[in-house]
Regions:
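Conserved HGGG/HGGXW glycine-rich cap/lid loop of the alpha/beta-hydrolase fold
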Residues: 22-70, 91
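Flexible "cap/lid" subdomain of the alpha/beta-hydrolase fold that forms the substrate-access gate
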Residues: 1-10, 19-21, 29, 64-103, ...
Length: 255
């Protein structure tokens, strides 16, 4: 098992959605939100240790893992970060957790940012990992960004083009993304547990491929509209922001 037996798996339905999540531990609540192309499984190496001090909640975002994977609407609004943030709040409310810490990586950090904007009163402290602001990244697109983050522009293409191309060999695409984003000096097999990789592959079905594409389509459309409204608003939440020393964000942006 990737997670300790003390973690309980649940799936709850609400607001025309269904979110899969694991939870367990003791102490104040800590919501952990994964990125692309992973699922809640990405936290398996740290969850047990964190659970000694915190009550851990690890959901699958909509469109990912074993959560709800709806067909994207024309305006992609059902994959907006506002909607994803509401999903996370619904999970925490279901568990009776009115105030909590939140940490997110990659796409999960963008959802965590939206949670801090829309539900500031619920957040004790936040941690964003490996992101720069979406609006800033699109607004300052250059060759380095377009090359390093080519998937931002590939996954948003319409008419199921990326879905069909990725769907030809999902396992290859998923593993290649993880390889390219991780330390080149460490062998792939040393960085990733085989069970975790197999779980990512199991979840990366046709619906999940579409869901992740819709996540990025929303980022380039409805999320930009929402971010424009709040782009000059500073968070009052105590915040820790982290980047990988060898990662793209640290090398590319003034962070």
């Amino acid at each position: 098992m990737l997670f300790d037996k003390s973690f309980k798996k649940e799936k709850i339905k609400f607001d025309n959605s269904e979110i899969n999540f694991l939870h367990g531990g003791k102490g104040e609540a800590l919501l952990l939100i994964h990125g692309f192309p992973q699922t809640h499984t990405m936290w398996h190496k740290v969850a047990k240790e964190l659970a000694k001090k915190y009550y851990i909640v690890c959901p699958d975002l909509r469109g990912y893992g074993d959560s709800f994977k709806p067909t994207g609407l024309k305006d992609h609004s059902n994959y907006s970060k506002k909607v994803m943030a509401k999903d996370m709040i619904n999970v925490m409310d279901y568990l009776g957790l009115k105030k909590f810490y939140v940490a997110g990586h990659d796409r999960g950090a963008r959802v965590a940012h939206r949670i801090c904007l829309d539900y500031e009163e619920k957040i004790l402290k936040a941690c964003f990992m490996d992101i720069a602001p979406t609006y800033h990244m699109f607004e300052n697109t250059n060759q380095a960004f377009a090359t390093g983050y080519y998937h931002w522009f590939f996954l948003i293409q319409p008419d199921y083009l990326p879905e069909k191309m990725i769907g030809d060999d999902p396992a290859y695409y998923l593993k290649e993304k993880l390889k390219r984003w991780s330390d080149k000096d460490i062998a792939f097999e040393e960085k990733f547990d085989d069970k975790a990789i197999n779980e990512y592959i199991r979840c990366y079905d046709e619906a999940s491929i579409h869901g992740s594409c819709e996540d990025y389509r929303a980022a380039a459309s409805i999320d930009m509209i929402d971010d424009e409204k709040t782009r000059n608003r500073k968070l009052n939440t105590p915040l820790l922001v982290l980047w990988g020393e060898k990662g793209f964000v640290n090398k590319t942006y003034d962070v």
